[in-house]
Curated annotation (Swiss-Prot):
Species this chain originates from: Homo sapiens
Family, as annotated: Belongs to the MICU1 family. MICU3 subfamily.
Location of the region described as Disordered in the Swiss-Prot/TrEMBL record: 92-115
Role summary: Tissue-specific calcium sensor of the mitochondrial calcium uniporter (MCU) channel, which specifically regulates MCU channel activity in the central nervous system and skeletal muscle. Senses calcium level via its EF-hand domains: compared to MICU1 and MICU2, MICU3 has a higher affinity for calcium. MICU1 and MICU3 form a disulfide-linked heterodimer that stimulates and inhibits MCU activity, depending on the concentration of calcium. At low calcium levels, MICU1 occludes the pore of the MCU channel, preventing mitochondrial calcium uptake.
Protein name (record): Calcium uptake protein 3, mitochondrial
């Protein structure tokens, strides 16, 4: 700082006083310490006044000098930071930040700072590491299901993203990952070694996903298919199997099963968020692993497909797809699709095995049971039951209920003595939710007759619609949760509307969205467009 002062303000020459009362000036213009008289002689009042004026003037000059130095240093620091972050502003046009037309003919200046380097676009069959900024950019063009899959996926192989079995369990039982996910890149050889530990379908159990943990992969279309399984009644299992079994031999082979890959892909394209085609191409590569041709069997049915669910799309279009150009391209699709845990589990390591209905039914039932067991155990703390309040909390997850405390207080005060909900009661209730549409028809009959439904009528309607018998304690607990007006009656508005949200956990999209990353990506896109 002293050296900087000398450069900015060189010390003035010391000139002799013009009169006997003018004080001498020292370095930097400060009055020199002198008595101008005999030692020990006190200054006169006039000398004291002149010295005080000179001292004040010197302090003002010093203060302004220090402020100037600080301002100059601050401006230089800001400029350095901006240069380090954004590089040389002359590299692009001032309007949009992109290269001008003349940039193609003129040689580029050498880089002058550590600006952000452009990230290369991923090509098919090429493994790249994608930064967090690119993840947020692609989220702008993804649907809610695609964003959730990418949020929980942890494996990347040749540009395509996969979930592990553990990732899938987290995606359907938690709101968001505990830590930010990073995609672990695997080679084809490493992936095949991982799939070698997949058990055959006849060795499946209700702990399959928990036993595999990180030793397996699930593609995006399989993720959608598994979500369908979680929300369908057992009666729908036979329908699903018959859709795949086009030749009627009571067996499904790998080619027949892979039809869902193309059906779900085309269904999803109807819901794509329009925008940058390059970004959409990168997103399709991540989700499906290859770019399929634009002409598709389902393209002519686009308007009708938009309003359908994935399950309806699969049910209505599987046979149509198999007897169209998809059947002719079955070998091409099989060669493009990367083997996954489900494909190896169903059809063996060589893909030659066939799947019968008994094994298919057992797999779907085991998956539903496994997810319910995980949710139940997360609240039971090793006990055989969960509290009625915890049961209410589980039912209200993934719903649009803003103030859940009202429902929880109903249980807390209406059931002061905790009896608990067993796993059998817990499982039977969620099996009932998978038959909610049939139950809603029965419940609407009471609404049309302007009748409220009581506990006995509710229990009978459940049995008629689903064949399930609820225990009196389970029925009473359900009424205490949803009977907000405390009239011991249940209405369509109090129950059916909320349970429809709960049934489609993760399938209709979660109400908790990452607002800040989406806003930041949108703002960045808007700034770059100007």
């Amino acid at each position: 700082m002293a050296a900087l002062r000398r450069l900015l303000w060189p010390p003035p020459r010391v000139s002799p006083p013009l009169c006997a009362h003018q004080p001498l000036l020292g370095p930097w213009g400060r009055p020199a310490v002198t008595t101008l008289g005999l030692p020990g002689r006190p200054f006169s009042s006039r000398e004291d006044e002149e010295r005080a004026v000179a001292e004040a003037a010197w302090r003002r000059r010093r203060r302004w000098g220090e402020l100037s130095v600080a301002a100059a240093a601050g401006g230089g620091l800001v400029g350095l930071v901006c240069y380090q972050l954004y590089g040389d502003p002359r590299a692009g046009s001032p309007a949009t930040g992109r290269p001008s037309k003349s940039a193609a003919t003129e040689p580029e200046d050498p880089p002058r700072g550590r600006g952000m380097l452009p990230i290369p676009v991923a090509a098919a069959k090429e493994t790249v590491a994608i930064g967090r900024t690119d993840i947020e950019d692609l989220d702008l063009y993804a649907t809610s299901r695609e964003r959730r899959f990418r949020l929980f996926a942890s494996i990347e192989c040749e540009g395509q993203l996969f979930m592990t079995p553990y990732d899938f369990i987290l995606a359907v039982t938690t709101d968001e990952p505990k830590v930010a996910k990073t995609w672990k890149s695997l080679s084809k050889q490493e992936l095949n070694q991982m799939l070698a530990e997949t058990p055959p379908v006849w060795k499946g159990s209700s702990k399959l996903f928990r036993n595999l943990k990180e030793k397996g992969v699930i593609s995006y279309t399989e993720y959608l298919f598994l979500l369908c399984i979680l929300t369908k009644p057992h009666a729908g299992f036979r329908i699903a199997f018959n859709m795949f079994d086009t030749d009627g031999n009571e067996m499904v082979d790998k080619k027949e099963f892979l039809v869902l890959q193309e059906i779900f892909r085309k269904k999803n394209e109807k819901r794509e968020i329009k925008g940058d085609e390059e970004k959409r191409a990168m997103l399709r590569l991540q989700l499906y692993g290859y770019h399929s041709p634009t002409n598709s069997v389902l393209k002519t049915d686009a308007e009708e497909l938009v309003s359908r669910s994935y399950w309806d799309t699969l049910r209505r279009n599987t046979s149509q797809a198999l007897f169209s150009d998809l059947a002719e391209r079955a070998d091409d699709i099989t060669s493009l699709v990367t083997d996954t845990t489900l494909l190896v589990h169903f059809f063996g390591k060589k893909g030659k095995a066939e799947l019968n209905f008994e094994d298919f039914y057992r797999f779907m039932d085991n998956l539903q049971t496994e997810v319910l067991e995980i949710e139940f155990l997360s609240y039971s703390n090793g006990m055989n039951t969960i509290s009625e309040e915890d049961f209410a909390h589980i039912l209200l997850r993934y719903t649009n209920v803003e103030n859940t405390s009202v429902f929880l207080e109903n249980v807390r005060y209406s059931i002061p003595e905790e009896k608990g909900i067993t796993f059998d009661e817990f499982r039977s209730f969620f099996q009932f939710l998978n038959n909610l549409e049939d139950f809603a028809i029965a419940l609407n009959m009471y609404n049309f007759a302007s009748r409220s439904i009581g506990q006995d009528e509710f229990k009978r309607a459940v049995y008629v619609a689903t064949g399930l018998k609820f225990s009196p304690h389970l029925v009473n607990t359900v009424f205490k949760i949803f009977d907000v007006d405390k009239d011991d009656q249940l209405s369509y508005k109090e129950f059916i509307g909320i349970m429809k949200d709960r049934l489609h956990r993760g399938f209709r999209g979660y109400k908790t969205v990452q607002k800040y990353p989406t806003f930041k990506s949108c703002l960045k896109k808007e700034l770059h467009s100007r």
